[in-house]
């Protein structure tokens, strides 16, 4: 329908009429308006009722939560108070009154913090750090029932802490009158509290095959790699593969490796050694040789001894630490005797020294290597004063270069050794180490 402006204006004016006009124009308007207002009031009442119910429910929920929190907090407070009371009671029962003496048992129950405050030295731990420790001689020692067990000792060193042998502690005991196996434990500690241990198993047996007349102490000098021979190659050198062959033969044939205290007791007729006993020694402590000794002795688990020249005491001590091995024991080859100046034998300086000078040398060189069980005379030269000094120094054995076995009844201050040359065949080696 086309737009009629007059009609539109009339409708607008009708909407703006006062209430009386609307009532006149529409007699039912009032009742309709009242119904709308009543309905609106009813809706508002219903809405208020609903809101009131929701508010009440929310209030109840909040009150319940507050009660729960209060209850939980109360429990925490009660538990804390109980724990505090329990701790106080424990302290009161642990720490004695100052008027009462503290028993040994109570002292051991003191909290660790007190022990740390009183501690003056590092506590040992199970971490060995860089300590290397090994048993002197065979780790399986044999004793005939009724004979005395001879303690062979152990050796230890650390690249960072040097020689540790003098501080080794020995524990365990052997009843040599009762057959069985016994364990001796050696413990070395450094200044940082690191602890390393080695064990010896002592077998007390009713009987065994023994050495009858003597024992071979082998004398080697230097070891070299076949691909890099020394320029001054001579009989004092042995190629590493041949030394490896020697060690393999000894192990394959069940040889036993006695300690120097055992050798001394055997030579003096006080102790039996198992059949096929042998001692391996290497003179001078040359760097390359020490590297081979560490590798080969560890490979075959054969103990060997390096007689170290200690003229440069710092360098010698550093070698002991650098080449520390469970299977390499370091002993003295003197500080000032490995040089010419004497008038006997090979012209070694020992014959120009007094007994006291020799004794001082022995003690100082033993301190460098950390052990005083054995000594090798430089150039094999010895004198009566030298032998007296060895005895006064308390060494178990001292060795010359006289080419022979050590026999029962020999003088332990001047024992023989069997020279091993790199030029010898394996058959010659076998002949030299076996008792005929």
Language model: regions and residue ranges:
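N-terminal targeting leaders characterized by basic, low-complexity, disordered sequences
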Residues: 1-63
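Hydrophobic single-pass membrane-insertion segments
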Residues: 85-101
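Solvent-exposed, low-complexity, repeat-rich "mucin-like" stalks and linkers
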Residues: 111-161
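Metal-dependent polysaccharide deacetylase catalytic core of the NodB/CE4 family, i.e.
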Residues: 213-237, 274-278, 286-385, 411-415, ...
